């Protein structure tokens, strides 16, 4: 057992500690018990799964875009996105169709970049995949380009020499097919 009085009376020059009250502790300090660690090794992936389960209940969008899925949508595909224009009230729906230029994999913050030419002007639309504002994402054509692109980011499609075929005919065909269904 440590005796503070005996230690300070040794004459080793520790009187200044006594004056500051350090030697006045009668019993040793009891430290609190350590907090238990997380049950899972990768806490971040567990959090992402939980967020994804809330935002994407049937995990349709996860299967559509995640790298681990063999039948995922790849850049170059033609997509139709239906989103709510005034989100809390789900009255009106906006549609945007375009070529998929890029997929950003950032967990719950993953997003896609679509491009289309509207009235001669190139329009790009960056939208988060798991946003509750998006009603549905439909694949109109797996590969809208002539051959399969070998890049993850098709930024070269912005150049004027790469004229993309119009998407309007695919959108009209999709709308006609779905209007007749009850």
From Swiss-Prot:
It is found in: Mitochondrion. One of its GO terms (molecular function) is structural constituent of ribosome. GO terms for cellular component: mitochondrial large ribosomal subunit; mitochondrion. GO terms for biological process: mitochondrial translation. It comes from the Eukaryota. Residues 1-21 form a transit peptide. Component of the mitochondrial ribosome (mitoribosome), a dedicated translation machinery responsible for the synthesis of mitochondrial genome-encoded proteins, including at least some of the essential transmembrane subunits of the mitochondrial respiratory chain. The mitoribosomes are attached to the mitochondrial inner membrane and translation products are cotranslationally integrated into the membrane. bL19m is essential for respiration. PANTHER family: LARGE RIBOSOMAL SUBUNIT PROTEIN BL19M, RIBOSOMAL PROTEIN L19. This is Large ribosomal subunit protein bL19m. It comes from Schizosaccharomyces pombe (strain 972 / ATCC 24843). The gene is img1.
